[in-house]
């Protein structure tokens, strides 16, 4: 059994088309898209239409919830601020109602039970929290605590835009003979069993954040559990594609003008495959007093202080050529 796992397309139809072409060659038995199919890049409508024509399994991510929650009682009033949330406002006017209905019908997670393979759990973030994710640097104890109620040993997530293939072992209780506990004399079966999880993140199709601008996904192959814990071996893939049409779209569709600072930061992330949005927010919290400058003024001060805009221009394919 071979599964293709895609995630975090973020409206990048060109990256999605490149990955789909590679999947035609690889011929997996099934394709799963693990959330965040829309927003960030200006072609969400085309991505939704593309996915609706497939038989792929699709999961909602946090960006689908941004769209579905806006203009409802679930959205905070702060989302009405066009300076901070103009990107979302632009998206609202560029998806058709039936596309929104499609997003509303998607599940938040999947648990797959193929008869010839071990079960696996798939969520965009962590169970019950689609805006949380894991990284390769996160302590194993924190991950095992989060997954304690997940019975499946293979856990596929996304959200961080980072490719992950990591085995997590829950810390075992001290052996009774080490503590002097009378349980030392009990049967082995009464001791707390050792837990293990195989954490897999396919990376991002449309907007990777691991300093590699190629479109990224994963192939999972079912294997015996004594070969890989959880029974699924992962191979990560990275596909070169032409990013220039996606970058041009920020200007030709009006997203850059409507979305302001956030759209510009999304553009930067497509150029660098680095965490431009967190970089900016961390800098302004550390260096600027609250409620003094507008959001745009904060961003201009950030560029002036860090020279980050020059860093972007030196790498922008629309300015220097290449993909």
Report residues per predicted region.
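Active-site environment of divalent metal-dependent phosphoester hydrolases
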Residues: 10-15, 39-42, 63-69, 128-130, ...
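Beta-strand-turn-beta hairpins that frame and shape the catalytic cleft
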Residues: 1-3, 111-121, 193-199, 228-233
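Active-site neighborhood of divalent metal-dependent phosphoester bond hydrolases
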Residues: 53-113, 117-121, 129, 134-151
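Short beta-strand scaffold segments in enzyme catalytic cores
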Residues: 109-113, 163-167, 216-220
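N-terminal active-site segment of His-dependent metallophosphoesterases
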Residues: 1-56
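Acidic, His/Gly-rich catalytic cores of divalent-metal-dependent hydrolytic chemistry
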Residues: 175-323
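Ligand/cofactor pocket segment of small-molecule handling proteins
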Residues: 133-187, 192-193
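Active-site neighborhood of phospho(di)ester-bond hydrolases with catalytic His/Asp-centered motifs
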Residues: 6-7, 31-36, 57-62, 123, ...
């Amino acid at each position: 059994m071979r599964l293709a796992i895609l995630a975090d397309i973020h409206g990048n139809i060109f990256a999605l088309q490149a990955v789909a072409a590679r999947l035609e060659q690889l011929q997996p038995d099934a394709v799963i898209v693990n959330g965040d199919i829309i927003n960030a890049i200006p072609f969400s409508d085309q991505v939704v239409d593309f996915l609706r024509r497939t038989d792929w399994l699709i999961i909602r991510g946090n960006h689908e919830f941004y769209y579905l929650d806006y203009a409802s009682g679930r959205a905070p009033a702060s989302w009405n601020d066009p300076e901070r949330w103009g990107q979302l406002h632009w998206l609202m006017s560029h998806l058709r109602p039936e596309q929104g209905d499609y997003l509303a019908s998607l599940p938040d997670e999947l648990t797959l039970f193929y008869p010839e393979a071990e079960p696996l759990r798939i969520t965009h973030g962590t169970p019950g929290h689609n805006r949380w994710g894991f990284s390769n640097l996160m302590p194993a104890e924190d991950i095992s605590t989060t997954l304690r109620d997940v019975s499946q040993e293979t856990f596929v997530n996304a959200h961080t835009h980072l490719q992950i293939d990591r085995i997590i072992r829950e810390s075992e209780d001290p052996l009774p003979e080490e503590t002097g506990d009378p349980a030392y004399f009990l049967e082995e079966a009464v001791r707390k069993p050792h837990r293990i999880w195989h954490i897999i993140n396919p990376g991002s199709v449309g907007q990777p954040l691991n300093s590699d601008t190629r479109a990224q996904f994963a192939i999972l192959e079912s294997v015996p559990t004594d070969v890989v814990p959880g029974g699924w071996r992962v191979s990560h893939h990275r596909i070169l594609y032409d990013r220039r049409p996606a970058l041009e779209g920020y200007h030709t569709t009006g997203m850059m003008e409507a979305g302001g600072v956030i759209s510009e930061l999304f553009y930067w992330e497509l150029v660098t495959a680095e965490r431009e949005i967190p970089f900016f927010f961390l800098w302004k919290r550390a260096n600027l007093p609250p409620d003094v400058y507008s959001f745009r003024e904060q961003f201009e001060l950030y560029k002036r202080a860090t020279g980050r805009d020059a860093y972007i221009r030196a790498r922008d394919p629309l300015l220097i050529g290449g993909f």
